[in-house]
A protein has these predicted regions:
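Amphipathic alpha-helical binding modules
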Residues: 60-85
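Amphipathic alpha-helical packing elements
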Residues: 2-52
Length: 85
């Protein structure tokens, strides 16, 4: 499933993050039933698990883990929570 964040997207500032959140919400409106974690409870559980496992996820994709406070990292975390098991 293609999501609201492409692999090379960078979320450089608050405005870009707000635009990403709008795309994420639109993706949920259009594709929510297809998300692995369509309820808030499951989404938050997956978000927690993905953030905890994110060093391995970034390593598996050949990327360096961004520094703390990186907007793109948070966007990746929210995107991953849609499908992370």
């Amino acid at each position: 499933m293609t999501g609201p964040l492409l692999p090379d997207d960078r979320i450089a500032d608050r405005d870009a993050f707000v635009a990403f959140l709008s795309r994420l919400r639109s993706d949920y409106t259009a594709n929510g039933p297809q998300w692995e974690n369509p309820t808030l409870d499951r989404f938050l559980e997956a978000l927690e698990a993905w953030v905890a496992a994110s060093p391995a996820a970034y390593h598996n994709h050949g990327r360096d883990l961004p520094p703390d406070g990186d907007w793109t990292f948070f966007a990746h975390a929210l995107t991953a929570a849609r499908i992370y098991e």
